[in-house]
Amino acid sequence: MPERKAGSVMRTIGISHKTRYWQHYCFSNPPEGFRYERMVDIPWHIARIRVEFLANTKFFLPFAKADLYHTYNGVVANAHPWVIEVESYMPRYETMSPGNPLYKWALRRLAGPHCKALIFTSQSALHRNREHLLAAGVDPAKMSVIYRAVEQYEPRGRDADHFTIIFAGNGFFRKGGVELLKAFKRLGRPEARLLIISTLEVDWGVFPEPEVIAWAEKTIAEDPCITLYRRLPHEELIRHMRAADLFVSTTFQDPFNNTVLEAMGTGLPVICSDVGALPEVARDGRNGWVLPVANRTSEEIAEEITARMVQLMDDAELRVKMGAANAQIIADRFTLAKRNAALTKVYDAALGG
């Protein structure tokens, strides 16, 4: 990271929110020479107004001053310099036609002079958006990939009598919870334990039949080797990860699935899918396995998960090797130092150095 000159002015980056854990971690640890401050925008959610355009458009009120705004998925309406961090599609008006005047307005804002940079959280997100943004007149020099940072923890020490597998994510069915349940039941190993942190909700993307939902809930409730926490503070999730043996989430739809990265931060081998940014996060065969899920049946995915779990259970040396591989993978892409060095360049360019 470039050094700041003595006596240089601290510059304020106004952020829209830091509700997710990774945002709290990253925005609580700004690059040198900058500070993050929460800006006030119109709180549509408090008024229970759930309009896609309003939810993903930011108009900051003049209660606090910032040198630059940094939003997460939100197009800024203010006549003020801003950068936007993008995890999936942009503009984030999923149900809106590209011919809609509001959609066209958002593209003009992204191409306009006030938008200084589009920061994609993965190459996958950049690839998804690049062509239509270029067609809208967005300067390709504005676009870059800056990965999230993850906090790292030492393992707490595993339970020698059990092999603990963790799943975390409220969108249980979308994130591959059913396939993990099937795999766990096939495992048939008395030392295996499954810890699920989830509200078991059906959120978006995957809509299982009622009998599948009923089977999952019944299986979880009746198996004494499965523990369910519907709500758990994040620090407790991390505590459980640090004492576990494996994290599994073969999600079907996700732009990033940050819990995989958080599991890696605790030194866990991971079994995940090849969806979204995950092939950029995990390394197949190095710190776990990245499984294809498209055009495969639930049974086929479950069968492969079972095989990989058995492989790790029967090979302690491989388990240790895969867990230890996380440190270098994170060091290459997902540290605060890497993120903040890249953000410093973006912020400096946006503010004229």
Predicted regions and their residues:
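A short, active-site helix/loop in glycosyltransferases that binds the activated sugar's phosphate group
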Residues: G112-K142
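Conserved donor-binding/catalytic core segment of Leloir-type glycosyltransferases
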Residues: G157-R186, L194-I197
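Nucleotide-activated donor-binding/catalytic signature segment of Leloir-type glycosyltransferases, i.e.
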Residues: S198, P208-E235
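Short alpha-helical donor nucleotide-sugar binding micro-motif in glycosyltransferases
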Residues: R231, R239-A244
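Short hydrophobic beta-strand element within catalytic cores of glycosyltransferases
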Residues: P269-C272, P279-A282
